[in-house]
Amino acid sequence: GDQALRARHCSPQVDSALHYAAHFEVPATPEMSPANGVHHHPTASAQAFIAKVFPQWDAGLGLEVEDPAVELVCPGWTGAVVSKNAGDNKDRTLYVHMSTTTDRSQLREHMLAILDMASDRVAAGRVVFCLERSLPDLRSLLHGLCYVGGQATGAPGQRDPWIGLCPVTSLLLVTVNL
């Protein structure tokens, strides 16, 4: 390997560069995107996200949870993918939450990016938008989501039909089937 490469090159600079490159360690994946300063901690628990949305969440429900890195696609958003085994296939749902402090100037673009991510990269059958009931523009958000086929599925006291648990009372769940 290393000797054969050196035999083909007679330059000491090339030899030195090849030797250095052969022993170079690739750094770990960064936790911050240099493009926009967004932090992402892939080891942070998606279970914790789901437990905040569904206080009765129990990891023993037989559902798998993973981190889809929503905040890298849409800063200010968080989320988790929940998977159920359905025979030979996995039925997957992407749950997302927008912080109340999120910049709304790109809201439409972010929602479309989330829908694209869910169908393309995450292979989810639906996206559940977990909206804060206290949002000043909740009515217009609901209208926009209904326009793309969204349905309110998790009002306070109402079980989410997919997980079968009630969300915290501060959230309204809106499901868009893909």
Which residue ranges define each predicted feature?
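Non-catalytic substrate-recognition and accessory regions of acyl/acetyltransferase enzymes
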Residues: 1-109, 113-117, 121-131, 151, ...
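Conserved active-site alpha-helix within GNAT-family acetyltransferase domains
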Residues: 136-152
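Charge-rich, low-complexity amphipathic helices
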Residues: 140, 167-168
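Ankyrin repeat (ANK) tandem arrays and their immediately adjacent linkers/low-complexity segments
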Residues: 161-165
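Intrinsically disordered, low-complexity, Lys/Arg-biased terminal tails
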Residues: 146, 155-157, 170-172
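Conserved beta-strand-loop-alpha-helix junction that forms the acyl-donor binding cleft
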Residues: 129-140, 158
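Noncatalytic linker/hinge segments flanking ATPase motor cores
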Residues: 134-137, 170-174
